[in-house]
Design a protein with these regions (language model features):
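A Rossmann-like FAD-binding core segment of flavoenzymes
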Residues: 9, 13-103, 197-231
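Conserved mixed alpha/beta catalytic, RNA-binding, or beta-rich assembly cores of soluble enzyme
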Residues: 112-114, 151, 168-171, 214-215, ...
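A conserved FAD-binding loop/helix module that cradles the flavin
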Residues: 135-180, 262-264
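Surface beta-strand/loop "capping" patches
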Residues: 167-208
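Short, aromatic- and glycine-rich surface loops/edge beta-strands on solvent-exposed regions
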Residues: 201, 212-216, 242-264
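Aromatic sugar-binding surface patches on proteins
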Residues: 233-243
Length: 264
């Protein structure tokens, strides 16, 4: 199996339960892109080896797969020729990432974020086109359904308000940018009005970190939030809640960053 995201990990277990011998799960990154519990329950419990910083460089066989050639990769993810070895197998399963399905969003001309692959939304989940709302995996890929449900409630609440003509005029509009250590952050913009309720920010770390500090800053360097995290992983969504009034008082756009504490 090439790829160690949650679907690849779960498929490893499913294949084992169906009677297959899963020879290995290969991951090009130096860390797994799946939840820790899935690594334990889907690989460790079934004695399936996980090769980090490895990828397939060739698939062998003519009419049928007979094996794969695997190599370790360097820090720039380039295969190292002197590390190549073979794994005999008759099936290769590719689990190489999810992309939100956004044919409708593109047809409507919505602004699409280049990293999430979904529409750019504000804290109410309203897209770049007034009156059109989006939530869940169409906005960005989630690892937990709890956050999908939460986003759906937000989008439904404000879509209903919009339909009833109860929207408040935005006093300020600003962008939310991922800074150092952050790969993506949703919402990507904020439409703020007086009495703005709490704002939830959802983000993914750019790399695994232990004892990291999450910082939200205004353009002038004013710190709106500083929170310590025991661990941050690209595979696990980070969610923080902030008082909407804090953004009204900030200067300019907002940047969200993660910094790992120095290790001993």
């Amino acid at each position: 199996i090439l790829g160690s995201g949650d679907i690849g990990l779960i498929m490893a277990r499913r294949m084992a339960l169906e009677g297959c011998k899963v020879e290995a799960v290969l991951e090009i990154c130096p860390y797994s892109n799946g939840l820790t519990r899935n690594i334990v329950q889907c690989l460790n419990d079934y004695d399936i080896p996980l090769y980090l910083s490895h990828t397939i460089v060739a698939i062998e066989g003519r009419d049928r797969v007979t094996g794969v050639r695997v190599a370790k990769v360097d820090e720039r993810m380039r295969p190292l020729p002197d590390t190549v070895f073979s794994i005999p197998c008759d099936t290769v399963l590719l689990s190489v990432g999810l992309i939100p399905e956004n044919e409708l969003s593109c047809a409507l001309g919505l602004e699409i974020h280049p990293k999430t692959g979904g529409p750019v939304v504000d804290q109410h989940r309203e897209t770049s086109q007034a009156g059109i709302f989006a939530a869940g995996n169409v906005v960005h890929v989630h690892d937990l359904v709890d956050f999908v449900s939460e986003e759906a409630e937000i989008a439904g609440k404000y879509a209903a308000r919009c339909a009833r003509g109860e929207e408040s005029a935005a006093r300020r509009s600003l962008r939310v940018w991922p800074g150092d250590g952050v790969n993506t952050c949703v919402p990507q913009r904020l439409s703020l009005s007086e009495g703005e309720a709490s704002v939830r920010l959802f983000m993914r770390a750019a790399r695994p970190m232990r004892r990291a500090t999450l910082t939200v800053k205004g353009a002038g360097g004013d710190v709106l939030l500083s929170k310590r995290l025991a661990v941050a992983k690209p595979s696990e969504m980070i969610a923080v809640e902030m008082d909407g009034a804090r953004f009204l008082d900030s200067t300019g756009d907002v940047t969200v960053s993660l910094e790992e504490e120095a290790r001993d």
